[in-house]
């Protein structure tokens, strides 16, 4: 193999894209990963890091450009870590995400008879985020900065706009930055673990335009609190809720456990098709409301509900998917380990007049065995776990339950593939549909249908 050393300047042809969106050039089968390089491009690059099994390169010149390369519209794209694919046409982004799923399920796990559908995309893949989490800091000149982190770091890129956030959020961000400066609010400095203001979080109802503004502070005491609220109301008189969240943990976790309502309601309202949901500052709620409706509609299609089925909604959160399915089912049973989420789910069931739902707090693998002992036999089980996927104990419990169908929504297809191999003992993976919940990024959500063999 050719010698490869740091600072070498080389040329080559990009033959693949990684799941992180990096171009791959190979030298005698040894891979070099190069951010922002695209398949079929002939490039010049510099080796910046060499490991035992791979190297990292920096793109210097593109000698032959891909037909899928586009000019990134965001002026911060080269520095900000929020997006990874703005230089790739949207049609090619959707195809790349489908290829990721094919690679996981067919090439690696050999689900050769399972259908992988085209990625469900957006008509306008911008301004889709209904929640923004914006770190606050200071630059070397001791000025207040707000924006998003540089890739793989906690260095804040100061910015005035973000093309994937709701446009209202950037208006709030810029106004808050001005208010913090004017009132000389203490700013948290992560390295020193000192200061007050840590994050600004903004949530909006996609269909209702209700807005919640949350200030995350390092401690409860905040001398300028009332003045900040007054200035926010002057600038945004229609704001629904203003809250203070206290996080003094000095960790990477953005929000703490305690929240105080400073103005307005404790929650905001949003709608998904015909269902209404109360959303608190801590609620898990899908970031992209438009794509969530498409995702849930595909899940209902896979569930094949006629009105006579008993549905178990595991990892149910605030009840969004379960309540979405309730009008089409005989009864929906939801289970979630977070107590506040179950309280929200129960309230949401009342708001939507869903009398055919039951929501219980506990570990899914334990609660569903209790339901089984009570004679509750599900026809369909909904699974929507966090990125780490399902606990193996839960999978084994599910196998003993033997529902006719399992509909599995995942924000991490790699762990979904792992779980699919365990479910294969009794279930046939019929098909997987990727849904583009996060355009311009490498993330892809999937929904899969498993039928009992």
Swiss-Prot record:
S-adenosyl-L-methionine binds at residues 286, 315, 336, 384. It comes from the Bacteria. Keywords: 4Fe-4S, Iron, Iron-sulfur, Metal-binding, Methyltransferase, S-adenosyl-L-methionine, Transferase. InterPro entries: MeTrfase_TrmA_AS, MeTrfase_TrmA_CS, NA-bd_OB-fold, SAM-dependent_MTases_sf, U5_MeTrfase_fam. GO terms for biological process: rRNA base methylation. It holds the Pfam family tRNA_U5-meth_tr. The active site is at residue 411. GO terms for molecular function: 4 iron, 4 sulfur cluster binding; metal ion binding; rRNA (uridine-C5-)-methyltransferase activity. Its EC number is 2.1.1.-. [4Fe-4S] cluster binds at residues 74, 80, 83, 162. PROSITE patterns: SAM_MT_RNA_M5U, TRMA_1, TRMA_2. Signal peptide: none annotated. Belongs to the class I-like SAM-binding methyltransferase superfamily. RNA M5U methyltransferase family. This is Uncharacterized RNA methyltransferase SA1713. It comes from Staphylococcus aureus (strain N315). The lineage of its organism: Bacteria, Bacillati, Bacillota, Bacilli, Bacillales.
